[in-house]
Amino acid sequence: MTYTIIEVERKSGISSRKIRFWLDKGLFPHLYKDKNGVRYFSEKDIDWLCWVNLYRALGMSIKDIQHYKNLCDKGESTLEERLKIIQAQKAKNLAEIVNLQVAIAMLEYKEQLYIELTSKGKTKYKPRSFRECKEILDKEVRQKLNQEKEKDEK
């Protein structure tokens, strides 16, 4: 069975605008096109679309996705190179997670400060500088992450 872009949008939840953009970038070179220029997606194409959507959500560049797709098309001889691409993206995303954890910890610290100040009825205070907050929390978060890493390794 084949599907038009609008049908794929309904089926996948991915906007037709995104799909068309990715089509224009060459991420779907093997789509069937009828005499009127209407492109049709197979189930396999929809599966690839879902992977593209995930890779984009993870921050992978279109260029890297194109390269990855080209490697996939070449078959098993490119497995190691594809593995390296996936591992590199995973490493980037794990680094982003650590940065987000630090940022969330800073927000929680500020939140707790405001809760304490408002519960005591204080309206004037001297907040810690951003740098000071970050240094304190970086140390705490890094210790927490190291503890979690040690648990995972056991």
Please give the residue ranges for each predicted region.
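Basic helix-turn-helix/winged-helix DNA-binding cores
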Residues: 1-70
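Helix-centric, low-specificity signal for extended rod-like, repetitive segments
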Residues: 10-13, 49, 75, 83, ...
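Alpha-helical structural elements of signaling/regulatory helical domains
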Residues: 14, 60, 74-78, 95, ...
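A short linear boundary/processing microfeature
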Residues: 25, 71-74, 113, 117
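A broad detector of the eukaryotic-type serine/threonine protein kinase catalytic domain
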Residues: 51, 70-73, 91-94, 98
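Long, amphipathic alpha-helical segments that form or neighbor coiled-coils/leucine zippers used
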Residues: 67-70, 74, 80, 84-86
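C-terminal regulatory/oligomerization modules of transcriptional regulators
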Residues: 80-154
